Amino acid sequence: MKVVAFERQQQGTGASRRLRNAGKTTGIVYGGEAAPQKIELDHNALWHALKKEAFHASILDLEIAGQSQQVLLRDVQYHPFKQLVLHVDFQRVDAKKKLHTKVPLHFLNAEVSPAVKLSSAIVSHVTTEIEVECLPSALPEFLEVDLSKIEAGQSLHAKDIALPNGVALVAHVDAENPVVASATVPAGAVSDAAEGETPAA
């Protein structure tokens, strides 16, 4: 995904306010051997890009003054109550070095699972992203979590996620193995089932 930015000449709080009034958003690019670079971006284009999941979890081609560099979106600052992006941070990536970043989870097949079909359970998504490490070329836009076999009362953990070749959970996630989804039967559903039972003679 391509992002066009411009080198920022004006600095300071007053300058940032003037840029926002002109429909621009401030940002910074850091990392690698190059010095941090202050940039500005078109706010409306950035606002729409931020609505796309891939913009948050993909290697982006950031073009500044005709020169392109590969980056990851690392931070976004929003106005507390206006639909306004105040600032963005991008980190340069090295094609030969592994990176750590969070990848979105896409949950599939809950509706055909034993938990839902047999027990009328509710499958909850405990987290919507997981942190992985990989080379930039191996970074997936998302990871799929197959819920087709989950049963009532069961949970799926981070290590249950099928990872593509070259992608691994970061060390602390691998060690903690957190829950990513769980299936629970609502109390009302249990009561309904109990009421439907035939009393013993």
UniProtKB/Swiss-Prot annotation:
InterPro entries: Rbsml_bL25/Gln-tRNA_synth_N, Ribosomal_bL25/Gln-tRNA_synth, Ribosomal_bL25_b-dom, Ribosomal_bL25_C, Ribosomal_bL25_long, Ribosomal_L25_dom, Ribosomal_uL5_bac-type. Keywords: Ribonucleoprotein, Ribosomal protein, RNA-binding, rRNA-binding. Signal peptide: none annotated. One of its GO terms (molecular function) is 5S rRNA binding. GO terms for biological process: translation. GO terms for cellular component: cytosolic large ribosomal subunit. It holds the Pfam family Ribosomal_L25p. It comes from the Bacteria. Belongs to the bacterial ribosomal protein bL25 family. CTC subfamily. PANTHER family: RIBOSOMAL PROTEIN L25/GLN-TRNA SYNTHETASE, ANTI-CODON-BINDING DOMAIN-CONTAINING PROTEIN, RIBOSOMAL PROTEIN L25_GLN-TRNA SYNTHETASE, ANTI-CODON-BINDING DOMAIN-CONTAINING PROTEIN. Part of the 50S ribosomal subunit; part of the 5S rRNA/L5/L18/L25 subcomplex. Contacts the 5S rRNA. Binds to the 5S rRNA independently of L5 and L18. This is one of the proteins that binds to the 5S RNA in the ribosome where it forms part of the central protuberance. NCBIfam families: bL25_bact_ctc, PRK05618.1-2, PRK05618.1-5, PRK05943.1. HAMAP family: Ribosomal_bL25_CTC. This is Large ribosomal subunit protein bL25. It comes from Burkholderia vietnamiensis (strain G4 / LMG 22486) (Burkholderia cepacia (strain R1808)).
